[in-house]
């Protein structure tokens, strides 16, 4: 919950051994936009806690951004259009969030000169069908996938890491919404905490699904002159 102080303290204390030595590059998620009574608002606490790079936009400053580290260009997206415009959000609504962000993203990727490009986004671009009685949702691609994936194809993004569904899925390389070894590698990152969501059917593009019931897991990435090596534990 984005305004629950004890949750922030607990999480920040738990990562202190890491954050004391390694800079954090955070990605905005939906819970960072929740109030104490589970309404929605601007992510004020999140923006106050993390000094990520500016993006040049006064309204959406630091909600999405990019940075270079070694041979990798990292792009961190804001996928909170739904929360930014929800009827329970009593702050200023932002129906133009994705329009503004896409313009920035295209300019950012066009100027990129690094060997590797990695995108991080909270909402997963793939749409999974519910695996529970009485619930129905078509499998395919979410609105964020329909919008952003063609841009990732156009600028030859190498790796896309997403979250939100509390499960690990490796979809392999995808281009033009289909299996293609020349496309970006799409990995849905798994569970770092105790919130289990074992309610998703397998997607036709899944190449690996974590064993269920899923346990806590994390990922590492190693950059070599010729490879990006991603491992999940």
Question: How should these model regions be labeled?
Answer:
Residues 1, 112-130:
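Short acidic, glycine-rich surface-loop motifs adjacent to enzyme active sites
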Residues 5-113, 134-142, 147-148, 159, ...:
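Extended active-site neighborhood of metal-dependent phosphoesterases/phosphodiesterases
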């Amino acid at each position: 919950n984005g305004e629950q102080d004890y949750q922030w303290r607990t999480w920040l204390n738990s990562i202190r051994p890491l954050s004391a030595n390694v800079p954090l590059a955070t990605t905005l998620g939906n819970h960072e936009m929740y109030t104490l009574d589970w309404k929605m608002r601007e992510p004020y606490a999140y923006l106050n806690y993390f000094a990520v790079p500016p993006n040049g936009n006064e309204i959406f400053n630091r909600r999405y951004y990019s940075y270079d580290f070694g041979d990798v260009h990292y792009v961190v997206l804001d996928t909170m259009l739904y929360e930014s415009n929800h009827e329970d959000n009593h702050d200023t609504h932002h129906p133009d969030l994705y329009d503004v962000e896409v313009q920035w993203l295209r300019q950012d990727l066009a100027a990129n000169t690094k060997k590797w490009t990695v995108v991080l986004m909270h909402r997963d671009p793939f749409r999974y069908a519910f695996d529970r009685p009485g619930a129905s949702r078509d499998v395919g691609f979410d609105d964020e996938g329909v919008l952003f994936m063609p841009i990732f194809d156009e600028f030859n993004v190498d790796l896309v890491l997403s979250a939100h569904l509390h499960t690990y899925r490796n979809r392999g390389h995808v281009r033009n919404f289909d299996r293609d070894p020349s496309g970006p590698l799409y990995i849905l990152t798994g569970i770092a905490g105790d919130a289990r969501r074992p309610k998703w059917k397998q997607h036709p593009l899944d190449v690996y699904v974590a064993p269920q019931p899923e346990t806590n897991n994390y990922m590492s990435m190693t950059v070599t002159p010729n490879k990006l090596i991603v491992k999940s534990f």
